[in-house]
């Protein structure tokens, strides 16, 4: 971010910290910052050397260490271009650099944990319902609402991409462009790692499959919509699963691997894993497409250990939207709504770093973002300000004192 015109006395880095920390602490509205700007403890966290604001140059700002909601509003409305005639767009975003920053921050965290033999890149698009007439607003038939269709890409808990997309286009549009940007960065940060792409049936497209195999040279495990030809391939297994269910009275699943090619759209035969399952409610066949081959990757392993694990990504998206307000896309402009999504993403990266490093070895090592906030961040304390320091005095009866101390010690061990 940069200031196109000197309209604010507050540095961009302060505005970034102010808003990102506010999101992490649960303050979703800019109005909340009109109260936070007078909090010396919060000002110290943001990095202000004058946490009381007594040294501000302007009389109207004196006593306020941080920016108010109007300045933050101009910050959030920042676009990719500024204009001297537009008083609300004087803070300009270098959007390509923000995208790179999100990827870089997460990859640096991954590198601190060492290079694993294999990582999974999980892509998914979700709905972001809209209740106004925002730029890029379209009706989506599947979700039965006006919405955006943000594309998220994760590797485990690590956010690599958060792209706000209008819902008038296919959910998989743009994923190749994002992967072209992300995969070289992964190979640079984690040399020698094997990369496997995971996705739902929305990503089962010839152009994506061929690009992954022929150009990116990475493997994939992708959900496939069932059809009559696929069901015929596992008809015997479905009958056997039903028979076993009738005999034993408990769910039964049988896996089968086979090679399959569509009549028109695919360029080659590809390996499909069929799951023939019978439950109380009846038959439940599923199919996934993969480039992983036997004997190292059996049908059971591919489905149960690799594909089913991608369900965790849904939890990470929930954290983005429910805990960190990535669905607060209520400004008129698509660009400023994208900026809000990125700010929520950076707040997530901050909290995930807490979870991965500070809370490692504690009972909160897998806690959700809102649980970390509630138990470790938003706690009562006495704030005292001296000439040189800001003192925080916590209650001796604070119930999570032991976890707080362990988190503090773990953070001190990190060498950046």
Model-derived features: positions:
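Short, conserved catalytic/metal-binding motifs centered on acidic residues
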Residues: 18-19, 33, 72-75, 117-127, ...
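Active-site-proximal, Lys/Arg-enriched surface segment
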Residues: 50-51, 55-151
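Electropositive, glycine- and tryptophan-enriched low-complexity nucleic-acid-binding patches
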Residues: 141-190
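An anionic, glycine-rich sequence signature occurring as long contiguous blocks
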Residues: 219-322, 409-416
